[in-house]
Amino acid sequence: MSKKFGAMILCSAAAVAAAFFAQQKGLPTQQQNQVSPKAVSMIVNLEGCVRNPYKCPADVWTNGVGNTHNVDKTKILTIDEVATDLRRNIKEAENCINTYFNGEKMNQGQYDAMVSLAFNVGCGNIKTYYSKTQGKRVATTIYRAAQAENWILMCNRIEDFNKSGGRVLKGLQNRRAKEKALCLGE
């Protein structure tokens, strides 16, 4: 972290998960998240939690648990605000997996792993990529595998998403290995 952004104000993954589940209880069923508690804990632990804004390795303003939406560069979030953003961001990832990846046909481990991936890299980035040879965005192998309901191939392609800014990052390699294992039921 660059000194010009100041020190990170970390928050407890357990506290965020507890606030997430407390908020979830009061919601109508259709508004509740579909990922398992295991997936929520995994996402929070893999992303980490920082209450103040900072720039992530992709040079994007971020706060909370990997939140990049409407980040106020002057605000320190409460745990409840972090949990609210987390619920919204997981719901967005769930919508992606349900809409484009046949999420309703996946088992819970496959679903949880794919939601974690979509949460981390964004829906558009797991659905398509820019092909230099074709000069346009084309469907990813993971997207085509999910469309064909080839769940094993889909799970095995999770590790394709191990780069940020064109560089392979050890942290992303580790995360993808965990997501792949969850997806394959290991």
From Swiss-Prot:
Location of the active site: 47, 56
Lineage of the species this protein comes from: Viruses, Duplodnaviria, Heunggongvirae, Uroviricota, Caudoviricetes
Alphabetized UniProt keyword annotations: Antimicrobial, Bacteriolytic enzyme, Cytolysis, Disulfide bond, Glycosidase, Host cell inner membrane, Host cell lysis by virus, Host cell membrane, Host membrane, Hydrolase, Membrane, Signal-anchor, Transmembrane, Transmembrane helix, Viral release from host cell
Protein name: SAR-endolysin
Taxonomic source organism: Haemophilus phage HP1 (strain HP1c1)
Primary location: host cell
Family, similarity comment: Belongs to the glycosyl hydrolase 24 family.
Presence of the UniProt keyword Nucleotide-binding in the record: no
Gene: lys
InterPro entries to which the protein is assigned, alphabetical: Bacteriophage_GH24, Endolysin_T4_type, Glyco_hydro_24, Lysozyme-like_dom_sf, Lysozyme_dom_sf, SAR_endolysin-like
Subcellular location per the Swiss-Prot or TrEMBL entry: Host cell inner membrane
